[in-house]
Amino acid sequence: MNAPLPMNAAAQGARPTLAELEARDAFAARHIGPDSAEQQHMLKVLGFESRAALIDAVVPAAIRRRDGMSLGEFTAPLTEEAALGRLRALAGKNRVLKSFIGQGYYNTLTPGVILRNIFENPAWYTAYTPYQPEISQGRLEAMLNFQQMITDLTGLDIANASMLDEGTAAAEAMTLLQRVNKHASNTFYVAEDVLPQTLEVVRTRALPLGIEVKVGPAADAAQAHAFGVLLQYPGVNGDVADYRAIAEAVHASGGRVVAAADLLALTLIAAPGEWGADVTVGNSQRFGVPLGFGGPHAGYMAVKDEFKRSMPGRLVGVTIDAQGNKAYRLALQTREQHIRREKATSNICTAQVLLAVMASMYAVYHGPQGLKRIAQRVHRLTATLAAGLKTLGHTPLNATFFDTLTLETGFNTDAFHASATARGINLRHVDATRIGISFDETASRDDVIALWEIFAHGKAVPDFDTIEASVQDGFPATLARQSAYLTHPVFNTHHAEHEMLRYLRALADKDLALDRTMIPLGSCTMKLNATSEMIPVTWPEFSNIHPFAPLDQTVGYREMIDQLEAMLCAATGYAAVSLQPNAGSQGEYAGLLIIHAYHASRGESHRDICLIPSSAHGTNPASAQMAGMKVVVVACDENGNVDLADLAKKAEQHSKNLAAIMITYPSTHGVFEQGVQQICDIVHKHGGQVYVDGANMNAMVGVAAPGQFGGDVSHLNLHKTFCIPHGGGGPGVGPVAVGAHLADFLPNQDSVGYRRDENGIGGVSAAPFGSASILPISWMYIAMMGSAGLTAATENAILTANYVARRLSPHFPVLYTGQHGLVAHECILDLRPLQKATGISNEDVAKRLMDYGFHAPTMSFPVPGTLMIEPTESEALHELDRFIDAMIAIRGEIARVEDGSFDREDNPLKHAPHTAAVVVSDKWNHKYTREEAAYPVASLRTQKYWPPVGRADNVYGDRNLFCSCVPLSEYAED
């Protein structure tokens, strides 16, 4: 695989055949970075003659895949052009109608400057979560803008940097209130007019936690004596209710209030924080993010200040750098799941950063007046529609409204829907006798007239201008918003496109993403996100489809989804896949709920013990806790492998109640454990199920399959193994794959009519197919690689990791290796001995790498004081060597600390990264030169990345928590 590109014969002087000239470039040769010669060079360094020989030495023979991994019609790879053509044909089977369905999803107009310069820009979509703040200042600022936008519009004190969707945000709000409110009740009360998909996600979350969800009129909320109450604002049927008295009564009963609020409506109606909401959640989709058949979209959560340390997800804060300048960073990280582990109450990692950035920039571009004008237009058209419908004998059931009307249609509902569809319009099917209409920023007076004609029954429609001139607001004046919002200069400056374009460019220039350099983060798989894979995402046939559109309008989507599910089954060896989970954390959670449902179906619902190795990622114990399981930790031996004796002991001890074990394979230590089948056998012997975390699947596709060596269920990370970009912290897709015996329990979304099986668990995401619009990325990758290409990618991922480990091992100890001293697809460098000898920490090395133009490897996971490196198959030998040379040079700098030629405190590592401002300053008091600081290797003279800030002060940032946009005065001081 990865043979030289066509024309090789001609390049050597031979006359190419016509067949060679007609051959299109194989995509695998574009995706896999090292060419054949470079692969042979690396193999020679490792002492192997072929990739096959290397894989034989790395992967245990007992689990090696020998079946060729048939992908059916996609076994042979398609060219980029052919794959795009095949997918275009599927997209053409979808029908794009104007959807006035609403129910939390709306048509929107994405400004071209945002579409081209964020959504389609690899500087934004190939970045990783901003754990290294010094090289992430651009998107941290954009995320802070999002937080400011949310706090302003909701009237609350602090917001996080996005949630997975509105349903998940509401479920997280429920568990947050249960945690912080010491109320005797175990009841969460949900108003009957919440979005139905939100209610289902809340119920799914509540069930394993023993929370009772009661549904009823909002007016009865206080009588429920619940610890929390969820109110929709406006309601799903359009009502804009005054909740002040209800919120006061709930508070008097000891409860707390969650508002699920529409951001555009909040530009006109009173903010939830002003009428008593303690938490506000929702979706920012209508701020410029396409429908996408349900996602990805950035949910949000805002809370009162007293709840900030209990809030899930990422939180961006302001701090200072080493020179005292302002800087942004992720704040309060000690509350997150990867640190709290089984004590966590949420497993949310990063969520939907790319989409949050888009939504925030929509607000930046339009500004407060622009948003208000859009909202006023939507509301005016809705009011005009309502007034005209009244003249035609259709008085809306909701007396108040912002953008949504609900009509009683008797038994003519189907006829009205058919008439609307014939005009290219989708309406909401409420039930057999009611129809909903929700307007958005794409609505026009022509749409109003068309809807009048649909409901006219042959009557003459009224004159638009006459009706419009007399309409009044659809909500009471007492609910009209009085408070200002989006007053910060960032929302009042960049309205001209040139200004917006340059602002986005300035932010992107501050960051390091894959468009500039390799990102060698272990356990993150920062591989190529090929342009051809990204192109279909913005096709209208994929991006402009409502998630609840009629089935006959989404035929192409469903065929593509069916094909992708089959591809993933082939890759994993499992029998069935659900694409609903919209993050790896949600895939984990779904998998454990499936295991619980399976045990319950066999009369063994008492099985609630989840065994988890001590080396596991923090999401594993957090997910187990969310699924209602009790975590029992299994020890690992000195080589990082699961201690089989300890496993056997604990499996025996908990045999009657054993639900599952969660293992990662290859292990989080970067090796293929020899005893994985024994692990599976031990757990199965005691009635448990085996959950194989798919975070490291990039080391197994085509080589080994968890569904074949003993796994019962896995989640995958399409944003790792299957090329969906990380987006700076989302979006992601975390499909859950299961064996045949678990297939009946895959998630439904009954609230919107999506049911796989009557035994399926409830919805874990708001939309039936989660982040559907980015699924074409993985479809394209698999179709273009084919079976052999995917296998070659895996083999090269293992090859590059071992090459890096071998070349760096004389300089840094490689902490764990498998058989024959080899690693899987990543390696861990142990810096603890160096820190003990010199005081130089893994953080110092990480920050120094920025001066060399690199993103740091993963720090202190899974072992404190280490760096974990995953180079992936997409990096060419030149880039691998550039990184290796940088690490060796840094080791040389550490040696100078050891021998005393560098001061232990005043050296280039302790003061890294070095900004341009520091290097050119008249003041230079360091005991090393400016050249040693800025240009440690000669190659940097021709291509140099300058970090925009010095080392961020984490302690200062958490002690002086500030999570809103910096006042203008601060910019003046800079």
From Swiss-Prot:
Entry EC number(s): 1.4.4.2
SUPFAM superfamilies: PLP-dependent transferases (SSF53383)
Keyword field: Oxidoreductase, Pyridoxal phosphate
Cellular component annotations (GO), alphabetically ordered: cytosol; glycine cleavage complex
GO biological process: glycine decarboxylation via glycine cleavage system
Record PTM N6-(pyridoxal phosphate)lysine, positions in chain: K720
GO MF annotation, one: glycine binding
PANTHER family: GLYCINE DEHYDROGENASE (DECARBOXYLATING), MITOCHONDRIAL, GLYCINE DEHYDROGENASE, DECARBOXYLATING
Assembly behavior: The glycine cleavage system is composed of four proteins: P, T, L and H.
Protein name: Glycine dehydrogenase (decarboxylating)
Lineage: Bacteria, Pseudomonadati, Pseudomonadota, Betaproteobacteria, Burkholderiales
Gene label: gcvP
